Amino acid sequence: MKYDFTTRVNRKGQGSFKWEDMYAKKPNVADGIVPLSVADMEFKNAPEIIEGLKNYLDQVVLGYTMANKEYKKAVCNWMKKRHNFEIQEDWIINTAGVVPAFFSAIQEFTKEGDGVIIMTPVYYPFFNAINLQGRKLIDCPLIEKDGMYYIDYDLFDKLSQVSENKVLLFCSPHNPVGRV
């Protein structure tokens, strides 16, 4: 597949959160600046993706769907094949997305006032998921050395010994530093 990865697409006015947020905060931002705040495309869709979606849409009726047995089996197979980790189908809980998933996890496994450990810098919705639910944000900053980030295992061990700290909200691959 040959594709143009050099042409920038300005998504201003298209409802893109990161673009609209950038212009709201800095209305006079210079041309050529690209907001890299979220994992969102900066290039036109590849022709193969457009064609694949058109073919799919020709065959289906859009509506609400649910995860069926085949879906859950595929997830289990993926985890085994890609990560050598066996999971059970009943462990799989579907959510409306990753952000609602970790909001729900914090609500399920902690109570107000409990500590939730994060490793900063980290995906910005982690902060809201903790603070908006009345939990205490416990920072275990990553160590930056020669342009790479590393977990501070000594600090993490210390923080995990505190009985009020109930959950580690872990991002892997880590956003924004990219480490797995």
At which residue positions do the language-model features occur?
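N-terminal small-domain helix-loop-helix segment of the aminotransferase-like
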Residues: 2-97
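Glycine/Thr-rich phosphate-binding loops of Rossmann-like dinucleotide-binding domains
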Residues: 44, 102, 126-127, 177-178
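Generic structural signal for small/hydrophobic residues in well-ordered secondary structure
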Residues: 36, 53, 75, 92, ...
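Glycine-rich helix-loop-beta junction characteristic of Rossmann-like nucleotide cofactor-binding loops
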Residues: 84-85, 106-110
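Short beta->alpha connector loops at strand-helix junctions that form conserved
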Residues: 120, 139-144
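Conserved PLP-anchoring active-site segment centered on the Schiff-base-forming lysine
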Residues: 108-130
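Active-site phosphate-binding strand-loop segment of PLP-dependent enzymes
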Residues: 142-180
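A short helix-loop-beta submotif of the ANL/AMP-binding
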Residues: 132-137
